[in-house]
Amino acid sequence: MRAIGLMSGTSLDGIDVALIESDGETVRVRRGHNGRIGPLGPTGYRAYSDEDRALLRRALAEAEAIAVRTDRPGCLREAEERVTRLHAEAVENFLTENGLTPADIDLIGFHGQTVIHRPGQGLTVQIGDGARLSRHLGIPVVSDFRQADVAAGGQGAPLVPIFHRALARASGFEGSLAILNIGGVANVTLIAGNGDLLAFDTGPGNALIDDWMSERASRPFDARGSTAAAGRPDEALLAWLLVHPYFTRRPPKSLDRNSFSHRLVGPLSTEDGAATLTAFTVRAVARALDFASEPPRRWIVAGGGARNDEMLRLLRHHLRAEVTPADEIGWSSAFLEAQAFAHLAVRAWNGLPITFPSTTGVSAPMTGGVTARP
């Protein structure tokens, strides 16, 4: 099937769009004449405006009042309508730019915008109206990927590991491998030499750094990690942050974007605060090794963190292993999650499992998602 994946992550930067070909089990990988892996398909991006981002930040704050998942307090209804409309625009622009029509697309995987994720309370909410998006575009849409897993006692995250394994196999990787996605929250997929999966959120990703830079420097993120590189981490504060019980809890486990706050480093300078938060992300990742059945031979890094030179330097130092940005092996650092939700949509369409005991802690493999037809 030709499927489009849509991802709007907790970093609140914009909408990633990616087209792949998948049957739900395997992913079509193209190679160049030199054997190098080529793009899985075309990609696109629709940046959020400052106004969009401000509305979504308000939605995140006001989502704290949600008691049941259908609640839309404060600006949540407006934000949901905005998210749906912007995703429709993103797909329409993508189709036009690539000479495609809705008839060329079999399915869309629409993640939506997470505003609250508290699986311990049986609560996860991703705003965005899949049925409305399907009617507008004239294409079947799978959305609401996390709720069934959470309702069954799972963490509802991470969802991408089954795609990571399919992509690793299609790419010819053998042996133990770790795929680290550093978005707003960081998550890792550990693939053992025998193919067994273990996946979980390692800790904060870019969200705290982005919030810090927005507040202190009026910039949306720390470009290339240059601000962090100019500072010095506060070791005492880092030690205190890493005492949090989340880091010793056995996986599967997951985090909400707001589980930690950038204000914990409030007294520090802009540079030292960025350095401390960047080191916090990396050292939380290093703690993942405590749960690995075998040390990964290689770490492949995707998400915004793959474009942060200081974060990559620290990862290589603390992991003592080969650390490679996804782009360097022909994968897409920026669009890996969007590609994953295209693959997950096909799996859901075919009734295949998308979550597993070793990824979300759910009691048995289960499918998920809600399908809407135009």
Curated annotation (Swiss-Prot):
Signal peptide: none
GO biological process, one term: 1,6-anhydro-N-acetyl-beta-muramic acid catabolic process
UniProt keywords, alphabetically: ATP-binding, Carbohydrate metabolism, Kinase, Nucleotide-binding, Transferase
Binding site for ATP: 9-16
InterPro entries linked to this entry: Anhydro_N_Ac-Mur_kinase (IPR005338), ATPase_NBD (IPR043129)
Keyword Kinase applies: yes
Protein name: Anhydro-N-acetylmuramic acid kinase
Species in which this protein is naturally found: Methylobacterium nodulans (strain LMG 21967 / CNCM I-2342 / ORS 2060)
Gene transcribed to yield this protein: anmK
